[in-house]
A protein has these predicted regions:
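Patatin-like phospholipase
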Residues: 2-198
Length: 198
């Protein structure tokens, strides 16, 4: 947030110039290499798991990645995981077209449980009771025309997210997970530029 005003890495000018609302070169090259050097050696040496989720554009399903050896592959996965539909380009990981994992698995709690984790903490950006509007969303055939499964996933996204929220609230009520979330509705855009709001 502190760097948003100085570096201006979000906005329509990026979308118009590079077909990406985010300045990925700045975010994933300049920041980790020069501005805020990322300690890849410590990351690679850590025994902790770090799982990144993307949406496979060919299958319309979630892909989960762990990478602890190849720096450029880490960047590819992070770029894909950050590639928001409609405003960011498709990003390739291992020659497979990918977008943000939030399309199909916004809250990967089920995956954590399947991986054997029993003490989970879920961090949400919306207050309890929040639900997305689930009116029928039809993605026109010219949008992502090469990826019909992705279009299907995008049309189901809100319903899937709401179902995940229901599961989170139920498990929270049962004392099975800890949830960190705002107490009141948050009035910020998904890609917010106003530093005061953030």
């Amino acid at each position: 947030i502190d760097l948003l005003e100085k570096y201006n890495y979000i906005g329509l000018k990026h979308l118009l110039r590079k077909r990406n609302i985010l300045d990925f070169d700045l975010l994933f090259t300049e920041f980790p290499e020069h501005i805020l050097p990322y300690d890849y050696d410590t990351y690679f040496a850590s025994p902790e798991r770090f799982v990144m989720v993307t949406t496979n554009c060919m299958t319309g399903e979630a892909n989960y990645f762990e990478e602890k050896r190849d720096k450029s592959r880490v960047i590819d996965i992070v770029r894909a995981s950050s590639s928001l539909p409609f405003v960011c380009p498709v990003t390739y990981v291992d020659d497979v077209p990918m977008l943000d994992g939030g399309i199909v698995d916004s809250i990967p709690l089920q995956r954590a449980i399947a991986d054997g984790y029993t003490r989970n903490v879920v961090v949400l950006t919306r207050n309890r009771g929040y639900r997305k509007d689930t009116k029928d969303i039809r993605i026109p055939s010219f949008v992502y025309r090469k990826y019909p499964k992705l279009r299907e996933a995008l049309s189901r996204r809100c319903a899937v997210y709401n179902k995940q929220l229901e599961m989170v609230e139920q498990m929270e009520d049962e004392g099975k997970i800890i949830v960190i979330r705002p107490q009141k509705p948050v009035m910020v855009d998904r890609i917010e530029r106003d530093v005061q709001k953030l």
